[in-house]
Every structure is written in structure tokens, then in C-alpha cells.
Amino acid sequence: AAVPASASGVLLVDRAAIAENYRILKAAFLEKAVAAVVKADGYGLGAEQIVPSLVRAGARSFFVAQLDEALKLRPLLDRCHPAIALYVLNGLTPGTETLFADNTILPVLNSLGEIEAWSRFAQQRGTAQPAAIHLDSGMCRLGLPPDAVERLRGNPGALDGIVPTCILSHLACAEEPDNPKNAEQLAYLKQALTALPRAPVSFCNSSGIFLGRDYHFDLGRPGVALYGVNPTPAAPNPMRPVVRLLARILQIRAIDAPQTV
Ligand SMILES: *Cc1c(COP(=O)(O)O)cnc(C)c1O
């Protein structure tokens, strides 16, 4: 590959390497189901260019951050495969219920308020509505905090009309295998899951997959490792490189003191 004359640089994205990274992660996840996180336009590499390769490699669940990203990807995913689950991590913003349901996009419910809104919507429509439920096990960013989980335990009717297709939680320090936070989050998650109906559990981001089978549960949820970033920073990178930056050398100059640059 060369830099075209009209450009001073080119970023090359190797889609075959992304597909190979999906297979490497799936093998590390002991061949259980692995979703693909393609938020932020596929970590800046172009979600629409990447998604078909991931579907061909076997991905059947996708995660984005925002509903707008999901609305853009839904028709493409439908053309790739008839049964792709598409989740929005940022959750159910007020008034978006119809957009989610009519486009077969699944909200990740992050609070009791979102659970209440989705349950009410299901009852209004008269049909059960699928969704993921996000438990915060220590990341302290999004998801139900422990007190909300305990309120759900005491009031399972709050989930009426909701079909949980996935219960997810996010590791805060998985790239540090010796960090005690990992085991703390795992122990809390196991305890919190007893407050919820049974559903496939998704706990592992890229680095989490390499913490071993105790952390795996049912569905892997890697992002950055698909794109070649090392999920095990203390060890050699098991991923294939995906991105190559070529830049044109504009000029080479020979200079010497007292010249300055
Ligand atoms: C970004 C994100 C992921 C993917 O994490 P990586 O570290 O990029 O593998 C998984 N789950 C959630 C909730 C995220 O926000």
C-alpha cells in the first residue's frame, strides 16, 4: 500500500485481522458465545466497514454506546444475518422506548427508573419486551448499584413484562490480573445474580476473558482487543495487529548548529 499523492497519510484497517482476533478471543473464551463491542464507530475504525467481517466470524450480539449508533447499524446487521442482537450500553433515555422496540434494538437497563419505564412500555404494548440488565459490581459508572439490586430482590414484580436476555456487569481493572478488585467484583456479582431471574450473564471485556474461566459466565463482551490492543499488558500481545499508519515523508533536511529547529 502507498500513500496517495493527495494525502499526507493513510490509516489502514485490516478487517481480516479483526475477524482473526474475534476467533482468538473466542478460543480464549473456551468457544462460548462472544459478542462484539463496536461503540464509538468501532473504536474509531469504522463500524459499518467492520461489522460484516465480525458477523462472518460468528458474532451474533453487538454492543454500541448510543441509540443513534444502533439505528445506523441495524439495517446493515439485518442484511448480514437474520438474528443479530443489538444492545445500547447507555440505556433507555426517556421517550426512546418506541424507537428501541420498532427497530429491534435492546436497551441495557442501567437503573430502577429505566426498568420501570421499560416494564410500563411492555404493559402498554401488551407484549413482553427483551432487554439486558446492567449490575454495577464496582466500576461505579453505569448499572444498578447494590441498593437497587436489593430493592429488586424484594420486588421482583418490578420486572413484569421484561424478558432479560442478558445480565451484564463490567470489570474495572481486568487488565491487572493481580488486582484484588477483580475477585471482589466476581464475588459480588455471584451474590447479586441471586436477586434476578436467570439469564445469560456477560461479565468479561477484552481483558476479562484472560482472567480465566471463573470469570467467563456465558457471553464475552470484548471491544479493544478485537482492534489489536493488548488485553494482557504484562505479557506479549496475543492479538493480531489491525491498524497501520502510513505517512508521507515531506522533506529530509541536513542541518547543523547554529541552525535551530
Ligand atoms: C467498552 C465496553 C466494553 C468493551 O471493553 P474493552 O475493554 O474495550 O474490551 C464492554 N462492556 C462495556 C459495558 C463497555 O462500556
Model-predicted regions and their roles:
Residues 1-2:
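Short, basic/glycine-rich phosphate-binding loops at helix/coil junctions
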Residues 5, 9-13, 17-19, 29-191, ...:
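Active-site-proximal beta-alpha core segment in soluble small-molecule metabolic enzymes
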Residues 21-23:
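Alpha-helical scaffold segments that flank or form the walls of functional sites
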Residues 26:
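N-terminal nucleotide-binding beta1-loop-alpha1 segment
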Residues 178-261:
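Anionic-ligand-binding alpha/beta catalytic cores of soluble enzymes and soluble regulatory domains
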